[in-house]
Amino acid sequence: MDKGVLMLYNTGSIYNPETENSILSYKDVQAYLKSKVTYGLPLDFAYPAYSWGILMENGNFRAILHEVDFSNTLRYKETSEGNYLVLQEHYLENHHIRKGNVIRLETSKFNEIMRVKQLVASQMKPDSCHTILYHLDSLNLSTFEE
């Protein structure tokens, strides 16, 4: 094997209702890199370019949702940044969404990706140089266009 890929996504727990963003967290990556892990081969680095909704019921994980439209104010009410209370029972992506459920919207924020990229550059060997954006499609790419 000539090189590896350090996947810098899904860094947090989808199961913990206190998690702010399980896709990418600077604090999670920082703690991992502090452990001084070595791989013995050059690494490329993969960063997330996607978002999802984490469906919680009574504080317990139920599902990952990929296509949630929170603009429907009859179904959803934002209770805090990125957290939406379900107001109406409905089905979404073959999941029964119940009134009172909470959906946590998690995104790959450009500034967080850049912070993590700078952290990785300061901690890892200089022979590691390639950047990979994971799950890149036209919808996800549009969030990174200026």
Residue ranges of predicted features:
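Substrate-binding surface in catalytic domains of secreted glycosidases
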Residues: 1-70
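Substrate-binding cleft of secreted/luminal carbohydrate-active enzymes
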Residues: 44, 50-52, 57-146
